[in-house]
C-alpha cells in the first residue's frame, strides 16, 4: 500500500515540474504584452423618443467591455423594474450605442424600460425609464381644444349694463361651493371696477358647471340687514356711548364664506363693516359684524334668508378705546370680526375661524343647528380671559403684534392626508398680496408650517408660499393674488380661487390696479401632503398623460421666493434629451421624469407637471406647467416654444 502511494506521488511531482517549465518564459522567451484592464460595464438610462399610440424608439449607451454579450432592452407595463424575464428585444449592434424600436404597444399606457447586457454568468441593467404611449384620443382632444377667449382687460364691459358678459370679471374675495345641482356657486366681497356692483345689491353671486364659463346671478342681499344698526347701538349703549344712525350706503359688505351643510341646506357667513370711529377723533375705528344667511337651493339667488348676528370685534383693553385710528401698534381690538371661514369636521363639529390684521385669527366652535357660537358671548370688551368666548388664537405672524398683515383665513380638511389646512392672505391687497399655508391635525391647532414653525403657540411667518405677484415673459403679469377659497369636486381634484389684479399703470390706465379678475387654479398635493397652486389659471385642458419627450425644450422658470410688492419674473431654463439642464437657474444639473406620478425632478426638486392654458400666448393655447416645493421655496414653470 505504501509503495503504491509513493508511485502516484512521484508521477504527480513529474507532471508539476513539466508544467512549470512549459509555462515559464525563461530567460530567452520574448516579452508577452499584458492584457488590458477590464473596464466595468455600465448602461445609461434609456432615452425614449418618437412615441406614438403603439410604438417608441429607445436608445442607451454602453461603457466598458461589451463584446460577446447579449444586449438589448427589456420592458413591461406592469413590472416597474423590468428584467429579461419580461418582454425582451435583443440588439445586435457592435458599437457603444444601442437603439431599438418597440412596437405593438397599447395606446395610453405607462411602460417601464431598461437596457441590459448579459453573459452566461450575470446580467447588468441600466436604471429604469418610464414613458406613456399616446392615447388614441389624445391628439384629437388636444388638437381640438379651445382655450378660454374672454378678455383679462374687461374695462370695455365693466359697466353694470354689461354684467351678463362679465364671466370672472369684477371678482374679489371669492368663496365657492359645489351644490346638489352640479353647479359651482361663487359669492364675493362688494368690489368692482368703477363700483359697478352698487346697482345690484350685495354679496354678488355667479355660477358655473365647468369652472371656466360663469353666469352672473346678481346680489344675494338687497339691503343692510335690519339687525345691524340696532345691534351696533345695543353695544354702544352698554359701552356708555350715544346711539348712531349711519348712512346705510357707507357700510362695507366683505368676504363671505359659503358651505353646504347637508342636502337642502347651505350657509353663508358674511362680514358687515360699520363706518366711522367709536367716539369721534382720537378713537379707534368702529366695529364689524359677522352675520349668517341660509338657503335651501342656491339656484334661487333670492332665496337667501338672513339669520342674524353671529359675532363681533372683541377688545382685551376694556373700554380704553381712545386710540387714534392710525396708531396701529396700540390697536383697540384684539379680534376683528371679518373674513369668516366655516368648517364642519369629519366628526360633525362646526367651527368658525375669522380675522383680519389685528392680533391674528381666533377659532370659535358653533352650534350645529343654529350656526351660532356654542358659548354665550359676554360683552365684547374686557380682559383676555373675559373675552375668551370670542375665540382662541390659532395663528399669528408675530405673537403680541396687534396690527399685522394677515387676513382672509380659509380652513379646509383633506381626508387623504388627515390634516386641516389654514390658507392665509399676507400683506396689502393691492399689489403685495401673497398666499401662505400651514397645517394641523386638529381644527383649532396648533398649526405648523413646512419649516416647523408653530404659528399657534409661538407665532411666526407661515410657509410655504403658494401665490405671489409674478410675470412670465409675455404680458403684464398679475399682482394682488390672494384671499382665496379652496374646494374640491368630490372626485379628487382640488382648486384654489382668488382675485388677481393688473399691476399699476398697465397700458397707460392709471386705474389698472382696480381691474380684478377671478382666478381659478388647480391644486396638486405633494407626496408628503402639502398643497401646491398651479402658475396659470384652470382652463379645462384635457389631462392627457404627459410624456418625457414633451418635457425636452425651453421652460420659463420662476422662483417664488418672497419679495414684498415685487413681481417675480421668469428666466428661461432648457431641458435636453440626455437629461441635462443646459441653461437657466439650474444649469449643469440633471433631470428625470416619473411618468406614472407625472413628476419631473430637476436639480433634485420634485416638480408636479400638468397640462393647462398658456394665457400669455396669442392666441391662447394649451401647454405644460410645473409647480414644485423645496422647503420654504416654491417654483413655477411653463413650457414655451
Which residues are covered by each model-predicted region?
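Short, surface-exposed linear motifs at loops/turns and structural transition points
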Residues: 26-136
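Bacterial N-terminal signal peptides that target proteins for export
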Residues: 1-11
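Hydrophobic/anchoring residues in structured secondary elements
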Residues: 12, 48, 107, 216-222
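Carbohydrate-active catalytic/glycan-binding domains of CAZyme proteins
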Residues: 28-29, 135-641
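Residue-level signal for mature regions of secreted extracellular proteins and peptides
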Residues: 11, 16-17, 53
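C-terminal motif of bacterial Sec signal peptides marking the signal peptidase cleavage site
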Residues: 19-22
Amino acid at each position: 500500500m505504501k509503495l503504491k502511494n509513493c508511485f502516484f506521488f512521484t508521477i504527480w511531482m513529474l507532471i508539476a515540474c513539466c508544467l512549470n517549465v512549459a509555462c515559464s518564459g525563461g530567460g530567452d522567451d520574448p516579452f508577452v504584452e499584458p492584457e488590458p484592464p477590464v473596464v466595468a460595464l455600465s448602461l445609461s438610462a434609456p432615452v425614449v423618443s418618437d412615441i406614438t399610440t403603439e410604438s417608441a424608439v429607445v436608445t442607451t449607451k454602453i461603457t466598458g467591455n461589451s463584446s460577446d454579450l447579449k444586449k438589448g432592452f427589456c420592458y413591461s407595463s406592469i413590472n416597474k423594474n423590468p428584467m429579461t424575464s419580461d418582454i425582451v428585444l435583443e440588439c445586435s449592434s457592435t458599437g457603444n450605442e444601442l437603439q431599438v424600436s418597440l412596437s405593438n404597444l397599447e395606446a395610453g399606457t405607462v411602460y417601464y424600460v431598461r437596457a441590459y447586457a448579459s453573459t452566461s454568468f450575470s446580467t447588468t441593467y441600466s436604471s429604469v425609464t418610464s414613458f406613456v404611449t399616446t392615447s388614441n384620443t389624445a391628439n384629437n382632444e388636444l388638437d381640438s381644444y379651445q382655450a378660454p377667449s374672454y378678455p383679462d382687460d374687461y374695462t370695455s364691459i365693466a359697466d353694470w349694463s354689461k354684467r351678463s358678459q362679465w364671466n370672472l370679471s369684477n371678482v374679489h374675495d371669492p368663496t365657492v361651493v359645489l351644490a346638489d345641482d352640479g353647479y359651482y356657486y361663487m359669492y364675493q366681497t362688494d368690489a368692482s371696477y368703477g363700483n359697478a356692483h352698487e346697482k345690484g345689491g350685495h354679496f354678488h353671486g355667479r355660477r358655473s358647471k365647468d369652472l371656466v364659463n360663469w353666469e352672473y346671478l346678481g346680489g344675494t342681499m338687497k339691503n343692510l340687514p335690519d339687525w345691524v344698526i340696532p345691534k351696533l347701538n345695543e353695544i354702544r349703549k352698554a359701552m356708555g356711548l350715544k346711539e348712531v344712525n349711519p348712512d346705510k350706503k357707507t357700510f362695507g359688505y366683505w368676504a363671505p364664506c359659503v358651505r353646504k351643510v347637508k342636502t337642502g341646506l347651505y350657509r353663508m357667513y358674511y362680514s358687515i363693516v360699520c363706518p366711522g370711529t367709536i367716539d369721534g377723533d382720537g378713537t379707534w375705528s368702529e366695529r364689524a359684524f359677522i352675520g349668517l344667511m341660509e338657503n335651501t337651493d342656491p339656484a334661487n339667488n333670492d332665496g337667501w334668508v338672513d339669520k342674524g348676528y353671529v359675532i363681533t370685534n372683541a377688545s382685551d383693553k376694556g373700554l380704553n378705546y381712545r386710540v387714534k385710528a392710525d396708531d396701529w401698534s396700540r390697536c383697540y381690538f384684539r379680534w376683528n370680526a371679518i373674513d369668516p371661514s366655516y368648517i364642519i369636521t369629519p366628526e360633525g363639529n362646526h367651527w368658525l375661524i375669522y380675522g383680519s390684521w389685528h392680533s391674528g385669527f381666533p377659532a370659535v366652535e358653533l352650534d350645529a343647528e343654529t350656526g351660532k357660537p356654542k358659548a354665550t358671548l359676554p360683552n365684547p370688551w374686557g380682559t383676555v380671559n373675559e373675552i375668551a368666548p370670542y375665540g382662541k388664537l390659532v395663528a399669528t405672524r408675530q405673537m403680541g403684534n396687534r396690527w399685522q398683515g394677515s387676513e382672509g383665513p380659509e380652513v379646509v380638511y383633506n381626508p387623504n392626508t388627515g390634516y386641516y389646512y389654514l390658507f392665509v392672505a399676507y400683506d396689502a391687497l393691492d399689489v403685495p398680496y401673497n398666499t401662505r399655508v400651514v397645517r394641523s391635525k386638529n381644527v383649532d391647532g396648533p398649526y405648523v408650517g413646512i419649516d416647523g414653525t408653530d404659528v399657534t403657540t409661538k407665532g411666526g411667518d407661515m410657509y410655504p408660499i403658494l401665490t405671489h405677484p409674478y410675470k412670465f415673459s409675455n404680458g403684464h403679469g398679475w399682482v394682488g393674488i390672494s384671499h382665496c377659497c379652496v374646494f374640491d369636486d368630490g372626485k379628487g381634484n382640488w382648486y384654489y380661487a382668488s382675485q388677481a389684479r393688473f399691476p399699476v399703470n398697465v397700458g397707460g390706465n392709471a386705474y389698472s390696479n382696480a381691474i380684478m379678475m377671478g382666478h381659478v387654479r388647480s391644486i396638486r398635493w405633494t407626496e408628503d401632503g402639502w398643497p401646491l397652486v398651479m402658475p396659470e389659471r384652470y382652463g379645462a385642458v384635457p389631462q392627457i398623460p404627459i410624456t418625457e419627450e414633451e418635457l425636452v425644450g425651453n421652460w420659463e422658470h420662476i422662483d417664488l421666493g418672497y419679495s414684498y410688492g415685487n413681481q417675480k419674473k421668469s428666466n428661461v431654463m432648457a431641458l435636453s434629451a440626455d437629461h441635462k439642464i443646459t441653461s437657466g437657474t439650474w444649469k449643469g444639473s440633471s433631470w428625470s421624469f416619473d411618468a406614472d406620478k407625472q413628476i419631473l425632478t430637476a436639480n433634485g426638486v420634485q416638480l408636479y407637471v400638468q397640462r393647462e392654458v398658456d394665457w400669455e400666448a396669442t392666441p391662447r393655447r394649451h401647454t405644460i406647467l410645473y409647480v414644485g416645493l423645496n422647503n420654504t421655496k416654491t417654483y413655477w414653470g411653463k413650457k414655451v416654444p
